[in-house]
Amino acid sequence: MIENKVVISARAEEVVRLLKRKYPDSKCSLNYSNPHELLVATILSAQCTDHRVNQVLPELFNSYPSVKAFAFADLNKLSQEIYPCGYHNQKAKSIQGSSLAIMNDHGGKVPQTMEELIKLPGVGRKTANCILGECFGYPSMVIDTHMIRIMNLLQFATSKDPKKIELELMEVFNKRDWVKLTHMVIDHGRAVCIARRPQCDQCVLQDLCPSVLR
């Protein structure tokens, strides 16, 4: 049965309510103390676990304590320091390039708009939304693999394209819940709605999910 917008919105509100009860302490799992550190951490997290990234960050931020330090780092040395995170050569170029752009174009401060953020080397909508929501308090949703999979299973999204999903979800969920929703869905995807072995019988959303395995 095709749901109308009122029914979809009501189901979305209930999903948020149940997830908040299940994951009251959900938050960004990357460790950072300022917007630039989160930018670096998010670049490193591509195709890498947050746990592995967090293992690398303390020594990395000790070696490069500022935007300027990253901007003028020795690229080969930086690449080796982030080697455990994978794709180290490309990530090093992105980190240095974005840091240099922040120095040259933004006075050493991470910009606070989507338009300016996605102009930085290595920064896409996912990283930009993470920074906007976490550091600057703007309503935003990070569309990662968990969000793509679970929102399609819940039939709140009908695409695999992150930007299209982001726009679809903005129409469904209350703006006040966007940032928190991302973290709760990620936690749910790691703990219960696991890609290859979803534990539907343990899922708090099983009565609301059209894709539940009975």
What are these regions (language model features)?
Residues 2-214:
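Catalytic cores of DNA base-excision repair glycosylases
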